[in-house]
């Protein structure tokens, strides 16, 4: 039985107990959430993973994406990025390589970390077709499903699968047009294949077969967002919403069949449309876990897109988004390096916490309360221990060490907190 089938029968599994303990919640809450499709726990029959719950009532989680490109193929660098992402605090990792030895690189990454690892199987299928036949459009349907199964057997335990890119969404896209084009690589691959071959997307037309494969290997289905906007001016357009309708319908079919399901959301959205996107998705999907790619709230800041994402992600989390894909400073410019990965994870973790302060104030705000008291008391060791990145906080202060060990060089002898502490008590 799958974990969904266990949950529907009232069985509380060991995985549910572990996630409940990590979240400070009752295991029955987790079981009910999985049974209803509101919570997922990526697991794998092929490897031990650090369990992580995603969904309503749980802390907002962060995914870090890595992977070689056709220009830069460095297996060991990707392994180092994966290790750095886990150390920096990522909750999951996606290996999205588009070059080199697909399964070989992914196996090295999977073996190097304890996190759940996700993938996009159609990347492998299309790129191997290009290598073999000279073009992605010559990929066969059997090759697509074989790539999916091969990656599942390797221990990949959640997959972004572009089920909603079908003839209906493609017609909507062509009729409506885009200012920023189509930025989803999976969406671009599949739509090109469909138009050349004049055929329906096999991930849609053979969806039940896809579910069988994923169910056999206990893989979480993340419905890929192939029609997402690549520019804020295209956000929430007809193609995006049409794909969302299809994905939420297919997501329910998959859950009814015993599969865990995540619904992917868009990546470029102006702030005034974020609430709309989250609420529409939650209502249409029956409140399944919502995974947003960023999101980026403006398009004008290449080199600083991790900051742009933090703004959009914090608002998204506050409205109910459950799962955020990080964005690094290299987004739209280059393949990220190790430092970019670390910065992306840290920035998105800050955004997730800010969102959780609104979404779950009783749980999330205690951390900030403790930090406020430590600052009031000028307890530097306590401040370091509470910091999101204790090593960085300590290093910054020590790099500009104050004469007065109670203060910092921002205020020096005129530290407001020290003056107040010397003259009256504001303890609370």
UniProtKB/Swiss-Prot annotation:
Binding of [4Fe-4S] cluster, residues: 408, 411, 415
Record-listed substrate binding positions: 94, 123, 162, 184-186, 225-228, 264, 291
Pfam family, one: ThiC_Rad_SAM
InterPro entries linked to this entry: ThiC (IPR037509), ThiC/Bza_core_dom (IPR038521), ThiC/BzaA/B (IPR002817)
Keyword S-adenosyl-L-methionine: yes
UniProt cofactor note: Binds 1 [4Fe-4S] cluster per subunit. The cluster is coordinated with 3 cysteines and an exchangeable S-adenosyl-L-methionine.
EC number(s) given by UniProt: 4.1.99.17
PANTHER family associated with the record: PHOSPHOMETHYLPYRIMIDINE SYNTHASE, CHLOROPLASTIC (PTHR30557:SF1), THIAMINE BIOSYNTHESIS PROTEIN THIC (PTHR30557)
Function, as annotated: Catalyzes the synthesis of the hydroxymethylpyrimidine phosphate (HMP-P) moiety of thiamine from aminoimidazole ribotide (AIR) in a radical S-adenosyl-L-methionine (SAM)-dependent reaction.
Name of the protein described by the UniProt record: Phosphomethylpyrimidine synthase 2
Native organism: Methanosarcina mazei (strain ATCC BAA-159 / DSM 3647 / Goe1 / Go1 / JCM 11833 / OCM 88)
């Amino acid at each position: 039985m799958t974990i969904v089938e266990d949950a529907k029968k009232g069985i509380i599994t060991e995985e549910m107990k572990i996630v409940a303990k990590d979240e400070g919640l009752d295991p029955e809450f987790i079981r009910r959430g999985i049974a209803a499709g509101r919570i997922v726990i990526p697991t794998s029959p092929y490897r031990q993973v650090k369990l992580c719950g995603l969904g309503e009532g749980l802390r907002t989680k962060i995914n870090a994406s890595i992977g070689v490109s056709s220009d830069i193929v460095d297996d060991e660098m990707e392994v180092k990025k994966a290790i750095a992402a886990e150390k920096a605090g990522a909750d999951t990792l996606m290996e999205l390589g588009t070059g080199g030895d697909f399964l070989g690189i992914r196996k090295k990454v999977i073996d190097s970390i304890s996190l759940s690892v996700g993938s996009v199987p159609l990347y492998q299928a299309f790129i191997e077709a290009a290598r073999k036949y000279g073009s992605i459009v010559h990929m066969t349907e059997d090759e697509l499903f074989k790539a999916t199964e091969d990656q599942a057997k390797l221990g990949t335990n959640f997959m972004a699968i572009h089920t909603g890119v079908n003839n209906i969404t493609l017609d909507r896209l062509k009729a409506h047009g885009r200012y920023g084009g189509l930025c989803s690589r999976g969406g671009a691959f599949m739509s090109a294949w469909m138009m050349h071959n004049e055929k329906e997307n096999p991930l849609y037309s053979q969806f039940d077969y896809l579910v069988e494969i994923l169910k056999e290997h206990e893989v979480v289905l993340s419905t890929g967002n192939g029609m997402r906007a690549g520019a804020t001016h295209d956000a929430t357009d007809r193609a995006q919403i049409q794909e969302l309708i299809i994905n939420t319908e297919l997501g329910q079919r998959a859950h009814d069949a015993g599969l865990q399901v995540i619904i992917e959301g868009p990546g470029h959205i102006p702030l005034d449309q974020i609430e709309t996107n989250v609420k529409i998705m939650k209502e249409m999907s029956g409140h399944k876990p919502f995974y947003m790619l960023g999101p980026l709230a403006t398009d004008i800041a290449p080199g600083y897109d991790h900051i742009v994402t933090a703004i959009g992600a914090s608002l998204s989390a506050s409205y109910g988004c459950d799962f955020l894909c990080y964005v690094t400073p290299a987004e739209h410019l280059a393949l990220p390096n190790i430092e970019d990965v670390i910065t992306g994870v840290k920035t998105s973790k800050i955004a997730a916490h800010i969102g959780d302060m609104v979404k779950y104030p009783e749980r999330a705000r205690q951390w900030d309360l403790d930090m406020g008291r430590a600052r009031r008391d000028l307890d530097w060791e306590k401040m370091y221990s509470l910091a999101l990145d204790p090593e960085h906080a300590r290093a910054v202060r020590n790099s500009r060490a104050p004469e007065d060990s109670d203060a910092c060089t921002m205020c020096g002898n005129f530290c407001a907190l020290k003056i107040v502490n010397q003259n009256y008590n504001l303890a609370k």
